[in-house]
Amino acid sequence: MARIGDGGDLLKCSFCGKSQKQVKKLIAGPGVYICDECIDLCNEIIEEELAETSEVRWEELPKPREIYEFLEGYVVGQEPAKKALSVAVYNHYKRVQAGENGGGAGREDAIELAKSNILLLGPTGSGKTLLAQTLARMLNVPFAIADATALTEAGYVGEDVENILLKLIQAADYDVKKAETGIIYIDEIDKVARKSENPSITRDVSGEGVQQALLKILEGTTASVPPQGGRKHPHQEFIQIDTTNVLFIVGGAFSGLEKIIESRAGAKGIGFGATIRSKLEIQASDQFQEVMPEDLVKFGMIPEFIGRLPVLTSVHNLDREALLQILIEPRNALVKQYQRLFELDGVELDFEREALEAIADQAILRQTGARGLRAIMEEVLQSVMYEVPSRKDVARVVITPDVVRNNVNPTLVPREPRTIGKNDGGRHEKSA
């Protein structure tokens, strides 16, 4: 087998047949041997296969209209934001594909396509995170969410900005090539606004310092990421990741920005013939629809940071009708989710229309938007979710408006009496 000669003292590789004298190293296994050359060849084959599978490729990149229609299935309302995101995401990945295919590289007149990161403004619970998650799901690219409030400038207590990239690498199962075409959503970016419009003399490590630290990775750079997260130290190995093709979607509530927009817009409404808009008219429209980069600078974002987020779009507060749609219309609507949970116990769950309206009203009162709907549903259904799995006599649960408004018990509809057929002598008996 692997031994040559009568003495049995000369061994050979079980794969290529070379003797131990012809190779540098021969490694023994249970009844087999492999040489260093075959190991190198195996590594090369595996690396080539991984390189082929790690690149995110589409047979055909979805067009903006197709992206918009996919978002429609999961996100209610917010049409302007969905259109802006559809176009921005399409252009971004078209640029990525052009780069992979050469894209005119080497030509003197070659045009370098710049990256278009996105700034998404809007109140909490209006669908910012869901929009980003749904985009990543459609495109089948790695996706990571980061909270800007946890970040600090390098060298201070808190998370380095490179830890955001580590989350993306982890989402890609440590496949760096795949991570380099992913999407990162940074939430609560308004919380790292500097304290005043003018540059700070003292060190603002969790505000302006974070914005400064994010500039390079937003624009596109090769970053060194510690594999285990945490702080960098000189004796550890780093993962190198190029952020040139990573799409950054940055979101925040920007509470108070509407006053800055209003004061700027109000200043233009002075003089004869000027268009005067009441506060009600401004509130009726999207409060961030008229935002300008200078408004964001006044809010506390540094100009360099805003410059790296060229696509500005916003989502608005959800009204009662939109919240009702969220409860029942999307593919993964909350009502459908809870109906499925009850169905697994063999029980139907029904909501009266007025009960759903009462749930929407509660979310508006709490000012939690769509995010608060699940919490309200949990409160409404908690007692019945505790009781029903232990009972075999309940066929249907009906949620009435009083259940939501006055905390009364839901209506439990018993199962129909079970009939025993002719073969059993025509007897009838009721289920327990």
From Swiss-Prot:
Region (Disordered): 411-432
Domain of life: Bacteria
Keyword Transmembrane helix among UniProt keywords: no
Annotated ranges, domain ClpX-type ZB: 1-54
UniProt keyword terms in alphabetical order: ATP-binding, Chaperone, Metal-binding, Nucleotide-binding, Zinc
Subunit structure and binding partners: Component of the ClpX-ClpP complex. Forms a hexameric ring that, in the presence of ATP, binds to fourteen ClpP subunits assembled into a disk-like structure with a central cavity, resembling the structure of eukaryotic proteasomes.
Protein name per Swiss-Prot or TrEMBL: ATP-dependent Clp protease ATP-binding subunit ClpX
Organism encoding this protein: Streptomyces griseus subsp. griseus (strain JCM 4626 / CBS 651.72 / NBRC 13350 / KCC S-0626 / ISP 5235)
